Curated annotation (Swiss-Prot):
Tissues where this protein is expressed: Leaf.
Gene3D superfamilies: Plant lipid-transfer and hydrophobic proteins (1.10.110.10)
UniProt xrefs under InterPro entries: Bifun_inhib/LTP/seed_sf (IPR036312)
Signal peptide: none
Family (UniProt): Belongs to the plant LTP family.
GO terms for MF: lipid binding
Function field: Plant non-specific lipid-transfer proteins transfer phospholipids as well as galactolipids across membranes. May play a role in wax or cutin deposition in the cell walls of expanding epidermal cells and certain secretory tissues.
Protein name as annotated: Non-specific lipid-transfer protein
Keywords carried by this UniProt record: Allergen, Lipid-binding, Transport
Amino acid sequence: KCGVSIPYKISPSTDCSSVK
């Protein structure tokens, strides 16, 4: 989802480009 933290990612950030 866009705008939420990404636990399965190295950095818990709102990666909108990664979660197209």
